Amino acid sequence: MVQDRLAVPRGRDRYGCAKTSIALAVSATLAGCATLDTSHDAASINTLLAAHGGPSTGWDRNSKDDASAVSSWLAHPLTSDVAVRVAMLRSPRLQQLYGELGLAHADVLQAVQVANPRLGISSLALQNGPGSQLVLGLAAPLVDLIALPSRTRLARLEQDRSRLRIASAVLTVSLDVESAWYRSIGAEQVAGMRAAVADALQTSADLAQRFFDAGNITELQLNRELAAASLARIAASRALIDARLARLDLNTLMGLRGSEAGWTSSAVLPLPVEHEDDPIVLRQTASASSLDLLAARKEATIFASSARTTRALRLLGGTTIGYDREREVDGSVIKGPTLDLDLPIFNQGGARVARADAQLRIAKAKLALIELSADNAIDLAVERVRVLSDIVRIHREELVPQREIVALRSQDEENYALIGEFEVLMAKAQEYDAYQGFLEAVRDYWLARVDLTRLVGSRLPSDREVTRNTPSVGDILHTGTAPPAAATHAGHATGADPTSTPTGAPEHHHNEGGQR
């Protein structure tokens, strides 16, 4: 702060005082108006999510209505849509994101705040003399005031980027829950099939023991059957643990514990879609609407604008403007504007400019890397989905029907005493293995589609084609249901068509509010 102790003519004094007062008043007004409305961030994020096929968020944490809704949802078999909706209300990761949204609000508001003006007061008295000198001074940072419009513009851009980033994180959580649901249902199906194989091989082992006790088979043949049954029990136990762990992971993502974690499921997965998406269309969709890509572009825009502002104001440094009023010992008053200027002799802001330019280069390189990686990753993910779809088809149309024929003809040959019961039981176990491979292939296919959805940043167009489900483990074990083409290959009917949605099974939809 500078105190001007030189008297000036009254006319110029009034003129200077008026200009300074107006400048400080305008500065205060600008600083007061430089606020951003963050009250609609939650609604804006939900709008972004809806545009990308994501779920709406429950921004009110654990209200009574939310608890009632969750209880109602969990009273029915859990679908992936319901799992995502529960997570939007209960997931600890979502609560963390809500907190990060509050931090983003604080950062944005902080960015547009001008440093408070400084008020200086001093009272100086003459030693052993009458009277005192009173000095009042008010100063404000000039750079903050000049840069305020630019900072406000940058803050709005940063606010938009924060919304995109939070929306992307929410979408990621929803896809994590969806993946966990597929893993849980798939693990439950595998556990059921491994248990069936273990039962079949245990039956074979028990039969072998009776034959050995009767002296009909050797000790070598007996232990072959016993060892196969032991391995099957081990595999069944591991599959059961895997299913429980997958269920635990899903409950953790949904934010469920205790009695709420005991939900039931229909334990069926959708069949692959008939026609997969065009990778060119998916790349175009990702380029236009991927939340991560949009956030990276917004970040590059922010650093470009920040670099321009830094370069324009590099010489001002810590310059302040103000107004002083001084009352002398004799009662006279002098007053006027002040300017506290940093002379850019040694430091001309080169470091700030270099830092801003480096940040801009990093942001541009990051954006280019995201764009390149997205294109390449989408191509690879599309190919992976296609290959897994082919694997599902091979299981449905070839392997499972072939194993069914082997099991059926083995039974026929056993009836004519051409082969023994051990061969029949082994053929049945191999048939169950084929079914397990089919169910695992379907699970892997949907996990690959979720990964592709992550890369695209929105729901895949072909999601609307999902209409049919796989057979459940119960259908396979009790009704003889097989994938299509089994009847035509085997030359006999094996049960209900598994490509139709079983009674009571959830249909597979990706629109908000639907079930899958």
PLM feature segments, named:
Residues 105, 112, 119, 170, ...:
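Coiled-coil heptad-register positions
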Residues 80-83, 90, 97, 141, ...:
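Amphipathic alpha-helical coiled-coil segments and their boundaries
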Residues 84, 139, 206-210, 283, ...:
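Amphipathic alpha-helical segments within well-ordered protein domains
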Residues 34, 148-150, 157, 164-285, ...:
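Periplasmic alpha-helical coiled-coil/stalk elements that build and connect Gram-negative outer-membrane
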Residues 93, 100, 107, 151, ...:
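Charged, solvent-exposed faces of alpha-helical coiled-coils
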Residues 2-11, 15-89, 240-285, 451-516:
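Terminal intrinsically disordered/low-complexity segments used for targeting and assembly
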Residues 231-258, 366, 400-461, 484-490:
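Short segments within alpha-helical structural elements
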Residues 34-57, 85-144, 247-256, 283-351, ...:
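A small-residue-enriched
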